[in-house]
Amino acid sequence: MIQIKRALVSVSDKTGITEICSFLTKHGVEILSTGGTYDALSKAGIAVKKVDEFTGFPEILHGRVKTLHPKIHGGLLGDTTNPDHVKQMESNGIVPITLVIVNLYPFVKTVMKPDVTLEDAIENIDIGGPSMLRSAAKNHKNVVVLTDPKDYESFQNEFTTNNGKISRETAFGYAAKVFSETASYDSAISSYFNKRLGIKYPDKITFAFNKKQKLRYGENPHQDAAFYEPLFLKSQFEALQGKELSFNNMLDFDAAFHVASLLPKNAVSIVKHLNPCGIAFGETVLESFELARKTDPISAFGGIIGIHGRVEKESAEEITKNFVEGVIAESFSNEALEIFAKKPNIRLIPIAKFDEALDELDLRSLHHGLLIQNRDYDLITKDKLKIVSKKQPTEDDLEGLMFAWNCVKFIKSNAIVYTDQNSTLGIGAGQMSRVDSVELGAMKAQKVGLSVVGSYVGSDAFFPFRDGIDAIAKVGAKAIIQPGGSIRDEEVIQAADEHGLIMVFTGMRHFRH
């Protein structure tokens, strides 16, 4: 057990600090402190000694050096179970410090300000705080260290129960928390510096995330899971109503948001198992939803709806006629919320800045490492298209082809989508053979009574053989948009010409694994 006799206190987040220090002084614990923390404790009438009085050395360099002193770090690092340590401490006038309450300068909060300067950021890099935390955490068998105000209550309870002592097991748990905190802090600084320098892929990379919540389970009930949010980006998954978000819900919400956010205003995407099962945009959100749902109403059952716009009463009424897991949109009107409230299990997530909420990096974990890439946000404009067929597209054809192209990029490879000018008709997703995706997309459209005659076909990658083109012609589609780049492009173009199809190349592939 660790007897608490002397505490070093220096905090930026002063939540609960006067309460815990008042508790400590009532139990005879000496308090040492600096700067603003000293002022706050003194103002509250708590007996506290300045660190410079304790060390006999003044604060210097405008406060940059306050606690970096042998009397502080000797008191934190000295192992009082080691006779040599005790002897050296006594000969140098160093006394043990058995409790540290420290949290760090608000670096992340500072650099998230839109007008932050490099100088502001640098002045909010804490040096003394991490040093004290690490010293105390290293010597956790003799020192208790608190860096999270949420731990103050449990500390006080154990202190009271054990007559001023804390178990080494508890101290070890606090120490582990400290090293997570200091690692996260340094990661945030590293990320900020790399961003300032324009370095996307440094030789060594760390990511700082805070645990937002423990999830009931992962992708399947036998898997554990938790949700973490990055320090520099507040989580968008704040539900207005509905059941607790599951692991799979979060994946589908993210996908539905991603699809809708990169399409025109009022666009609607319906997602199931990370695949869109309907995408559309119309004059209103209601029109878009009705068009998107027609693509595959069976798969839309229990799906997640992404809406690039505001959900009004009429849209809410139509959505709630169906079983859906949730809706993510720019906003919801009060009338819409009243309607959704009658279906309390539907999860509702608003993202006010729909166009600005996209993260740049895509991370994929492997059993033996981590893959990082920039996200596939690039869009092709009509002027970049290369018309390779003899038959030329009209302006309306180009609009339809662009819509097909902007849809297919969100579908799992091998991906084929049949569309009209503003809604999907049939989706062939995730097949190992491209021609199978061609046939699947047409079959799914026909299954729900949608005709693909005269439709536009988007393919996420090139056609390796002409069989895909023959299959598209067989169902009566009008035009094809694809990246090109196959060694058999000439054969594929010839097939399009034989069937009187329009074909355009984008020069950009959109694999999605």
UniProtKB/Swiss-Prot annotation:
Gene3D superfamilies with a match to the protein in the record: 3.40.140.20, Methylglyoxal synthase-like domain
Record pathway: Purine metabolism; IMP biosynthesis via de novo pathway; 5-formamido-1-(5-phospho-D-ribosyl)imidazole-4-carboxamide from 5-amino-1-(5-phospho-D-ribosyl)imidazole-4-carboxamide (10-formyl THF route): step 1/1; Purine metabolism; IMP biosynthesis via de novo pathway; IMP from 5-formamido-1-(5-phospho-D-ribosyl)imidazole-4-carboxamide: step 1/1
CDD domains, A to Z: IMPCH
Record field: catalytic activity: (6R)-10-formyltetrahydrofolate + 5-amino-1-(5-phospho-beta-D-ribosyl)imidazole-4-carboxamide = 5-formamido-1-(5-phospho-D-ribosyl)imidazole-4-carboxamide + (6S)-5,6,7,8-tetrahydrofolate; IMP + H2O = 5-formamido-1-(5-phospho-D-ribosyl)imidazole-4-carboxamide
GO biological process, one term: 'de novo' IMP biosynthetic process
Domain notes: The IMP cyclohydrolase activity resides in the N-terminal region.
Family, similarity comment: Belongs to the PurH family.
Descriptive protein name: Bifunctional purine biosynthesis protein PurH
Name of the gene encoding the protein in the UniProt record: purH
